[in-house]
């Protein structure tokens, strides 16, 4: 446990951002019956997976894999989640270079953010809270900022769905500059993670 905690602190010490580091930690420790966190898997991360779960202090029922939408699940994600997005009023938080016109679903509102958005665009959290939206589906494609958004927006307003979907839209948004293995039938596209 101590190793994982130290690893988190070491990772963010180089940015000298104690405030944002604390917000990231709060996002993994926040508890609510309708709030779920994604953790790394033991097959890819060994003991770090157990350390992360223990560090979060979450009930196991409120945990899933951080990569639940990718790897061997990506084709399922595209056939189910991606198709269902047209049934919602979508608010998308993604990189400012995103080509949202390529998406296979409509967006009601796009919030462009920069790289290191969890620091550079942190004020967006309060801006969204002030709008007091209802019945919206917020999709986060913004790195660690997605964790902060999901936590703080859910804590403030439980009348929406907040979903950190990571890199799943990158084939359409094309903001990352490279292709991930699971998009192109590579090794990870067949990778099946095991919980224990």
Regions found by a protein language model. Give the residues of each.
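Structural motif
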Residues: 89, 136-137
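Residues at the C-termini of beta-strands that transition into short coil/loop
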Residues: 41, 111-114, 166
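Redox- and metal-dependent alpha/beta enzyme cores, enriched for Fe-S-associated oxidoreductases
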Residues: 84-127
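Glycine-rich phosphate-binding loop signature in dinucleotide/nucleotide-binding domains
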Residues: 131-134
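Gly/Ser/Thr-rich loops at beta-strand to alpha-helix junctions
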Residues: 41-44, 96-99, 139-148, 169
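C-terminal functional extensions of proteins
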Residues: 145-196
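Electropositive, gly/pro-rich neighborhoods at or near active sites that engage anionic ligands
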Residues: 1-102
């Amino acid at each position: 446990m101590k190793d994982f905690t130290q690893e988190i602190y070491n990772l963010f010490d180089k940015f000298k951002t104690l405030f944002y580091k604390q917000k990231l930690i709060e996002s993994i420790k926040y508890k609510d019956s309708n709030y779920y966190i994604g953790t790394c898997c033991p097959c890819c991360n060994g003991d770090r997976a157990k350390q992360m779960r223990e560090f979060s202090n979450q009930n196991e029922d409120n945990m899933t894999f951080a990569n639940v939408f990718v790897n061997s699940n990506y084709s399922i994600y595209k056939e189910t989640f991606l198709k269902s997005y047209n049934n919602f009023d979508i608010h998308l938080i993604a990189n400012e270079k995103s080509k949202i016109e390529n998406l296979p679903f409509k967006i009601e509102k796009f919030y462009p953010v920069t790289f290191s958005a969890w620091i550079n665009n942190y004020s967006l959290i309060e801006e969204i809270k002030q709008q007091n939206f209802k019945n919206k589906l917020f999709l986060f494609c913004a790195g660690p900022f997605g964790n902060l958004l999901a936590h703080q927006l859910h804590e403030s307003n439980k009348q929406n769905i907040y979903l950190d979907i990571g890199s799943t839209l990158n084939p359409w948004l094309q903001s990352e500059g490279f292709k991930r293995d699971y998009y192109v039938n590579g090794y990870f596209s067949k990778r099946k993670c095991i919980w224990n």
